[in-house]
From Swiss-Prot:
Class of this enzyme: transferase
Protein's name according to its UniProt entry: PR domain zinc finger protein 13
Effect on the protein upon substituting H619L: In PCH17; uncertain significance
Subcellular location: Nucleus
Annotated family: Belongs to the class V-like SAM-binding methyltransferase superfamily.
Function (record text): May be involved in transcriptional regulation. Is required for the differentiation of KISS1-expressing neurons in the arcuate (Arc) nucleus of the hypothalamus. Is a critical regulator of GABAergic cell fate in the cerebellum, required for normal postnatal cerebellar development.
Any one GO cellular component localisation term in the record: nucleus
Entry coiled-coil feature ranges: none
Ranges where the record places region Disordered: 184-213, 226-255, 336-372, 545-567, 647-707
Classification via SUPFAM superfamilies: beta-beta-alpha zinc fingers, SET domain
Length: 707
């Protein structure tokens, strides 16, 4: 459910069959789907909708615009009936039926994958299992547990303090404005931001660089009212009047809306920056990979940026656009001085130049060619030291987030002129593929470096599309993928603060240090689990991303996964303790009891506890009265199965055999009836890792017991 909090919650259910593919919308107002989602479903009034002449209406005949905001967020994919979609990035948001909705079924919605990436909502959720084998979803930042995956995703996006999703240091706009903790942007002459939703109306990239002397920029992106916009009372994004742009307060509102549309408002997403005081442009890079994992510590960049006073990484302060962040980090560092002042004449001139080239408008997520990065607020020291922030949307086993990245030498900044020429490999910065096209002179602009760093003379345009960083010339409208892999090269910072501003004052240095140490312990624990899983050949659910040797081993030795081939992707339920993979959830549930020691079953005769029902069934046979067919002829020990008896004779009575004891000749069978389904008569396909002292390692499952 999104919008204002409602008590009691109203749900929307179908009064008739709703066909798959039906579209509802557009969704009005501020889009905050999942902000009030929780594991519990509070009972409340229900609104029924039905099809009338091909359109869904409620009991009173109201259109979807009147009740679409009452549709609650889905907690998992099983109960989800609708998905939120947008035809274009920044376009209006609609709801689409995923399947045929039966009468009486509640309408629930969640983000589509593309829209989730746009809003920086995690798209994957890996469950863990508690001592009872129930699925739980853990936030690796604050250790809160959830029963449903979407509850965790919503928590990370809107509420988790440590991940930057909400509360505490990273306040939402409305919270920061109420507390008066938002300082005005230094040098811009703007008042503090008024209360505003999380996602504001989109605006052009030109508004990211306000200049007091420049004319009002022209909107070239079209009307986009559906996604990341202000409330319905906000002015139109297609025709901003000069009077609105002329006033400082209105200009601040428009600037905030533009920044909210840009990647800076996507502060909960991945942001990888390698900043250094280099004189070359490629010595420092930054980009948004797109999808982030909800289960690895990924808030370091945001926290580090907040700790160092980075304005565009704090939602509670004046923010800068994602294109600006990319441009500034590509430029090799920060330029000191106030914008538009004598301290940084280059910045002011470039801003003036930009406003006279309003036809070069791009999506706010794109970096315009020739746009200079903005300077930091006065007093912010220029950092010449290298800082690497480990935020990569790659599997944890493949890329470690705790290694150090060495800055590329200035020679790596030389851009080859060939269209598909490869950049020379730089130490510490391996480039898998980088083909730079010949940039049109119209898309280039020379920009003199500041006092602390130097921007390159050639700055291509960058954008993010489908989760991949693209670059190219805006004049040719041709973009090419740029893939950077920093796996195994990033080092975890020694000390880092999760908070800044008023929140930091409430915490002592010891508490801040303990937060970082907790994050390090989590990372080391996850790394150990990953190494164990990879060593067993079962640590990756997708064997296609494994090395050939490990993938081949995983295809033949996966526990409980059946006859999976080495070339087939392995899917199933993974044990986080030992890395075993099970095709059935029940198998993992029983297996987890061997690690946790949870034994809910008991023998009715001797009250011995068991965790595996198959072990209990085999144990009960030991209490059978009368003659048992599986008794050792050498020592009289009673066993449960034929294979247990054979194993017992081989280990306890070496040199003896069942055939010799039978005395019927070498070709005769002993007088033991075959076990049904022998030799594969296991009552369970669960691999048991016994950790208690009551287990007999000889039989591996309690098949041999002394009475």
């Amino acid at each position: 459910m999104h919008g204002a909090a409602r008590a009691p919650a109203t749900s929307v259910s179908a009064d008739c069959c709703i066909p798959a593919g039906l579209r509802l919308g557009p969704v009005p107002g501020t889009f905050k789907l999942g902000k009030y989602l929780s594991d519990r479903r509070e009972p409340g009034p229900k609104k029924k909708v039905r099809m009338v002449r091909g359109e869904l209406v409620d009991e009173s005949g109201g259109s979807p615009l009147e009740w679409i905001g009452l549709i609650r967020a889905a907690r998992n994919s099983q109960e989800q009936t609708l998905e939120a979609i947008a035809d274009l990035p920044g376009g209006q948001i609609f709801y689409r039926a995923l399947r045929d909705v039966q009468p009486g079924e509640e309408l629930t919605v969640w983000y589509s994958n593309s829209l989730a990436q746009w809003f920086d909502i995690p798209t994957t959720a890996t469950p863990t299992h508690d001592e009872k084998g129930e699925e739980r979803y853990i936030c690796w930042y604050c250790w809160r547990t959830f029963r449903y995956p979407n509850s965790l995703k919503a928590h990370l996006r809107f509420h988790c303090v440590f991940s930057g999703g909400g509360g505490g240091a990273f306040l939402h706009h409305e919270h920061a404005a109420r507390q008066g903790a938002v300082p005005a942007a230094d040098g811009l002459g703007l008042s503090p931001k008024p209360p505003a939703p999380d996602f504001a109306a989109p605006s052009q990239a030109g508004t990211l660089r306000p200049h007091p002397l420049g004319p009002p920029p022209v909107q070239a992106c079209g009307a986009r009212e559906g996604i990341k916009r202000e409330a319905s009372s906000a002015p139109s994004a297609t025709s901003p009047t000069p009077g609105k742009w002329g006033q400082p307060k209105k200009g601040k509102e428009q600037l905030d809306r533009a920044l909210d549309m840009s990647g800076a408002a996507r502060g909960q997403g991945h942001f990888l920056g390698i900043v250094g005081g280099s004189s070359a442009g490629v010595g420092s890079l930054a980009f948004y990979p797109g999808v982030r994992s909800a289960f690895k510590p990924a808030g370091l960049a945001r926290a580090a940026a907040a700790a160092h006073g980075d304005p565009y990484r704090e939602e509670s302060s004046s923010k800068q656009g994602a294109g600006l962040a990319l441009g500034r980090l590509l430029g090799g560092g920060r330029a000191c001085g106030r914008p538009g002042s004598g301290e940084n004449s280059a910045a002011g001139g470039a801003g003036h130049h930009h406003h006279h080239h309003a036809h070069h408008h791009h999506h706010p997520k794109c970096l315009l060619a020739g746009d200079p990065p903005p300077p930091p607020p006065p007093g912010l020291p220029c950092s010449g030291a290298l800082r690497g922030f480990p935020l990569l949307s790659v599997p944890p086993e493949e890329a470690s987030a705790f290694k150090h990245v060495e800055r590329a030498p200035p020679a790596a900044a030389a851009l080859p002129g060939a269209r598909y020429a490869q950049l020379p490999p730089a130490p510490g910065l391996p480039l898998e593929r980088c083909a730079l096209p010949p940039l049109d002179p119209g898309g280039l602009k020379a920009y003199p470096g500041g006092e602390c760093s130097h921007l390159p003379a050639v700055m291509p345009a960058f954008t993010v599309y489908n989760g991949e960083l693209l670059y190219g010339s805006p004049a040719t409208t041709a973009y090419y993928p740029l893939k950077l892999h920093f796996g195994g090269l990033l080092k975890y910072p020694e000390s880092i603060s999760y908070f800044s501003g008023p929140a930091a004052a409430a915490l002592s240095p010891a508490e801040l240090g303990s937060l970082a140490s907790i994050d390090r312990e989590i990372a080391m624990h996850n790394q150990q689990l990953s190494e164990m899983a990879a060593g067993k050949g079962r640590g990756r659910l997708d064997s296609g991303t494994l090395p050939p040797a490990v993938a081949a081993a995983g295809g033949t030795g996966g526990g409980g996964s059946g006859g999976s081939g080495a070339g087939k992707p392995k899917t199933g339920h993974l044990c986080l303790y030992c890395g075993k993979l099970y095709s059935r959830k029940y198998g993992l549930k029983i297996h987890m009891r061997t690690h946790t020691g949870y034994k809910p079953l008991k023998c009715k005769v001797c009250l011995r506890p068991f965790g595996d029902p198959s072990n209990l069934n085999k144990h009960i046979r030991l209490h059978a009265e009368g003659n048992t067919p599986y008794r050792c002829e050498f020592c009289g020990k009673v066993l449960v199965r034929r294979r247990d008896l054979e194993r017992h004779v081989k280990s306890r009575h070496p040199g003896q055999s069942l055939l010799a004891k039978a005395g019927d000749g070498p070709g005769a069978e002993p007088g033991y009836p075959p076990e049904p389904g022998d030799p594969k008569s296991d009552d369970s396909d669960v691999d048991v890792c016994f950790t208690d002292d009551q287990s007999d390692p000889e039989v591996g499952g309690g098949g041999e017991r002394d009475l």
